């Protein structure tokens, strides 16, 4: 299989799974093993193509991000208040991630821990879906500092590879009283600063693995990741108000043994 096809397949998997509550890590592990693309360079490539997925969310929510740079009298999720909410959400996982980065890389990327994270995240989703309380927060402009910080605390669960940042923040938001659609939308927006920081940090640490000859390979993965993430987020937001997350949970339980197998053997 050519390098460009490998890059395109991995970019497609990254884009489709990064913002869905299914764990992009688990899917990239399986896909990388099937394609025979593993090792330090593969890990760096997976980090790089995340930037394509991040850019897709920036494009989709450009008005919201632009609104953070200028106060708007009738929009509360804007200006300094909007920035403060995103900072509150990013803070817990940023602090914990920086403090425990080496430990996470060394001890939480084992076959058993990633597979268990997939299963635990699935059970968490099923439990949250059993709740029947009416949501208290309906739109981004109703977001409170307490809700933003609470979602940020749940985001720390995503430091466990395989748990899924989207699952942690969407389910955490719903548990704290956010409407299903709001929890998903805020999860995508709040992903940008922390994912950009984490991706940039990882790339800075591994930039020596890049060579000029790798540029077409990385560019292909980046572009495919951007396009597939754009489509996945658009479709997910269109459907999220009419569906539960139970199918995603059962799917995670089904692939957890596969992730363990491909990582262990």
UniProtKB/Swiss-Prot annotation:
Name this polypeptide is given: Undecaprenyl-diphosphatase
Transmembrane segments: 42-62, 82-102, 108-128, 143-163, 181-201, 221-241, 248-264
Keywords: Antibiotic resistance, Cell inner membrane, Cell membrane, Cell shape, Cell wall biogenesis/degradation, Hydrolase, Membrane, Peptidoglycan synthesis, Transmembrane, Transmembrane helix
NCBIfam families the UniProt entry points to: PRK00281.1-2, PRK00281.1-4, undec_PP_bacA
Further comment: Bacitracin is thought to be involved in the inhibition of peptidoglycan synthesis by sequestering undecaprenyl diphosphate, thereby reducing the pool of lipid carrier available.
Gene name tied to this protein: uppP
Subcellular location: Cell inner membrane
Family: Belongs to the UppP family.
Membrane topology, as annotated: Multi-pass membrane protein
Role this protein plays: Catalyzes the dephosphorylation of undecaprenyl diphosphate (UPP). Confers resistance to bacitracin.
